[in-house]
Amino acid sequence: MLNPRPCVPRLLSAVARCHKPYSTSIKSLEDLAKLKSLDDVDPDLVRKLINERTNELNSQAELAMLKQMQSQENQQQQQALKKFVRPMWIFLLMSSFFYLTGHYIWWKLEYDEREIELHKQVQALRQELDSAIAAKHSGKEPALSGAGAKKPKRWYLAWLW
């Protein structure tokens, strides 16, 4: 008996795989739907077309799910932001109120202090004026005019000379 070579069965199986008695004009599932019967269609082709369409649908579903998750995340961020907007405004208003109140009190104290200083200065000048007036009425020379013995120039002489 003749022993077949080991490469011959492989060659026969390769030829059998290459030779397809089925129709290959089918490119999509829509082409399959147009056929009356699936008897002449290669089951591997049907499986491949179904897998391709399933992959397309899965990728579309994943994209839709990602968009939905992204929109939900944006809504959650906006809601989280809304939770902090009102307290932030309240904090800003309260802090500005307290700052302005403190600043007003500080200005008021500074004003009062300056007013007391000026009042003391006015009192000192008033006393000096009163003493000068009293000295003038009593006939004495005022204490202010230490070098006042010289007569001042008349104003019209300054224009002429």
From Swiss-Prot:
The chain crosses the membrane at residues 85-107. Residues 1-22 form a transit peptide. Disulfide bonds: none annotated. Residues 108-161 are mitochondrial intermembrane. Keywords: Chaperone, Coiled coil, Membrane, Mitochondrion, Mitochondrion inner membrane, Transit peptide, Transmembrane, Transmembrane helix. Residues 109-138 form a coiled coil. It comes from the Eukaryota. Belongs to the INA17 family. Component of the INA complex (INAC) that promotes the biogenesis of mitochondrial F(1)F(0)-ATP synthase. INAC facilitates the assembly of the peripheral stalk and promotes the assembly of the catalytic F(1)-domain with the membrane-embedded F(0)-domain. This is Inner membrane assembly complex subunit 17. It comes from Lachancea thermotolerans (strain ATCC 56472 / CBS 6340 / NRRL Y-8284) (Yeast).
